[in-house]
Amino acid sequence: MNFTKIAVSAGCILALCAGCGANDTSSTKEKASSEKSGVTKEITASVNKMETIISKLNDSVEKGDQKEIEKKGKELNSYWLSFENDIRSDYPFEYTEIEKHLQPIYTEAQKDKPDAGKIKTESESLKASLEDLTEAKKSGKKASDQLAKAADEYKGYVKEQSDQLVKATEAFTGAVKSGDIEKSKTLYAKARVYYERIEPIAESLGDLDPKIDARENDVEEGDKWTGFHKLEKAIWKDQDISGEKATADQLLKDVKELDGSIQSLKLTPEQIVAGAMELLNEAGISKITGEEERYSRIDLVDLMANVEGSEAVYQTVKSALVKDHSDLTEKLDTEFSEFEVLMAKYKTNDQSYTSYDKLSEKQIRELSTKLTTLSETMSKIANVL
């Protein structure tokens, strides 16, 4: 993707690196250079740290050391989580590109037999995305009235989905606490839809996303596993929810806290478009592999919700595009429609889709191809807004 950037000059690099013995004049120059590039010393240092971890990960791949691959994959992901929120808010498009390549690396590294070629390829792309970040600058452009209105409209959509999420989670956790497994299965899928439509918003709000949506292997050693997927495992795998009342209560508490945070949320047009791209990346990277809903197998429910959330963004910015970029809006209209037609083949009723484990490799590839095409077209919005 081609985003507006400013290159970091050699003088700027020297200013950033010359920390020891710097006098007041050099400190002033360093600050000016940082402001000019838009990227702080802390971000540059964090990028350098990630590049070091990537190199060590690739060394482990070369040696075929599966334990070390898993360890470095987790370390890379954990380090990114330590500063990603600052990147998400100030550099949303660069953030999305980094996520697009980091997610498959992390997923692959956790496998018993990781694909070495895939890790290497994605690592190179990740390093390029990190380099783009170090050369990025914050947008100084004031949003047009149309785009500002679009951001407000999307915030209204997010609030509505969050409100429905609270209600659906109340019903779901109530079923869990009553011990009704079959009812819990039905209500689990309904609640997931509302969460997946606004997932990037939840991810931007600190620790709430891992509390609500972490899978078991995402939880750091010593941390407590909570949220939807802990209950999913109890319902489908263990088939015993008698001991999950505390988990249900915590999930509802966290979802309500998320809803409260969303009420005061401020969003820019850049952030909402990046969020739409992130949703499509999420669908194409984790949902399409069946990694997300490993016990319930409702991955297609999540996947469709991601696409619906992305389309909601598109519909809010469409009016700002249609006059000068009608070719792009027509293409997106067609591609969203085609994807919905394709997904309709797998719909079993108003609320559900075919279980992921019933799909053939050919069907999964077809869905993946459509998602990739849609994601690439959606990314063009970033260039024209």
Curated annotation (Swiss-Prot):
Question: What is the protein's membrane topology class?
Answer: Lipid-anchor
Domain of life the protein comes from: Bacteria
Q: What happens when the gene is disrupted?
A: Severe reduction in Fe(2+) and Fe(3+) uptake and in cell growth.
Q: What InterPro entries is this protein classified in?
A: EfeM/EfeO_iron_uptake, Imelysin-like, Imelysin-like_EfeO/Algp7, Imelysin_sf, Iron_uptake_EfeM/EfeO
For this record, the Gene Ontology CC terms, alphabetical, are: membrane raft; plasma membrane
Keywords of this entry? Cell membrane, Ion transport, Iron, Iron transport, Lipoprotein, Membrane, Metal-binding, Signal, Transport
Q: Name one GO biological process term.
A: iron ion transport
Which interval of the chain is the signal sequence?
1-22
Name the UniProt record assigns to this protein = Iron uptake system component EfeM
